[in-house]
UniProtKB/Swiss-Prot annotation:
Taxonomic superkingdom: Bacteria
Cellular component GO terms, alphabetical: cytoplasm; ribonucleoprotein complex; ribosome
Disulfide bonds: none
Entry's Gene Ontology molecular function annotations: small ribosomal subunit rRNA binding; structural constituent of ribosome
Family, similarity comment: Belongs to the bacterial ribosomal protein bS6 family.
Name used for this protein in its record: Small ribosomal subunit protein bS6
Purpose: Binds together with bS18 to 16S ribosomal RNA.
Native source species: Synechococcus sp. (strain ATCC 27144 / PCC 6301 / SAUG 1402/1) (Anacystis nidulans)
Pfam families per UniProt: Ribosomal_S6
Entry keyword set: Ribonucleoprotein, Ribosomal protein, RNA-binding, rRNA-binding
Length: 107
C-alpha cells in the first residue's frame, strides 16, 4: 500500500500549562503510531490570537504534526481530537508532494 503525506494542525486552549501542552502533543501522536503512521515532524507553533472567538477563547496554542500513512490513521486521530475538550479546532490536509526536510541554518 502506498504511503501519503499528511499534515494535521490543531488548536489547543490557551489556558493549558506547558506541561499539559506537551502531554496533549504526546496523546495525539499515539493514535497515529498505533495505527501504523510514521510521524515525520511535530511543531509546537506557540500561542496566537484567533481571528474570531472559538468556544469563548480569544487565543489558542497551535500544534502541527506531519506524518506518512495510507490514510486509515486519520479517523482515529480526528476522533480523539473531536472528543477532546482541550482542542478548539483541527484540520488535516493531504500533501501532494513530500515537503522538503528542514535545513539547519548556521548562525
Amino acid at each position: 500500500m502506498k504511503d501519503f503525506y499528511y499534515e494535521t494542525t490543531y488548536i489547543l486552549r490557551a489556558d493549558l500549562t506547558e506541561e499539559q501542552v506537551e502531554q496533549a502533543i504526546a496523546k495525539y501522536q499515539t493514535p497515529l503510531t498505533e495505527a501504523g503512521a510514521e510521524v515525520q515532524d511535530t511543531q509546537h507553533r506557540g500561542k496566537r490570537r484567533l481571528a474570531y472567538l472559538i468556544n469563548k477563547q480569544r487565543e489558542g496554542i497551535y500544534v502541527q504534526i506531519n506524518y506518512t500513512g495510507d490514510g486509515s490513521q486519520i479517523a482515529p486521530l480526528e476522533r480523539a481530537l473531536r472528543l477532546s475538550e482541550e482542542v478548539l479546532r483541527f484540520l488535516t490536509v493531504k500533501q501532494e508532494v513530500r515537503p522538503p526536510a528542514p535545513v539547519a541554518v548556521e548562525a
